[in-house]
């Protein structure tokens, strides 16, 4: 069983939102709307949040 199968609906929605935010940061960086440093900061923050949710679901 994968960790995401244990998520509540609210946690699943939160993970999805973090994944979208992370993806949008990479797109914004690729199009020159934000710096690489800003993109890295957003990606790191989203990854940490997803990891915390995953650890709670494991």
Where are these regions (language model features)?
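Hydrophobic stripe of amphipathic alpha-helices that form coiled-coil interfaces
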Residues: 32, 39, 53-56
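N-terminal acidic leader/helix
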Residues: 1-33
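Short intrinsically disordered terminal tails
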Residues: 1-5, 52-58
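Short, charged, amphipathic alpha-helical segments
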Residues: 12, 36-47
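Generic structural signal for well-ordered, non-transmembrane alpha-helical segments
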Residues: 16-19, 44-51
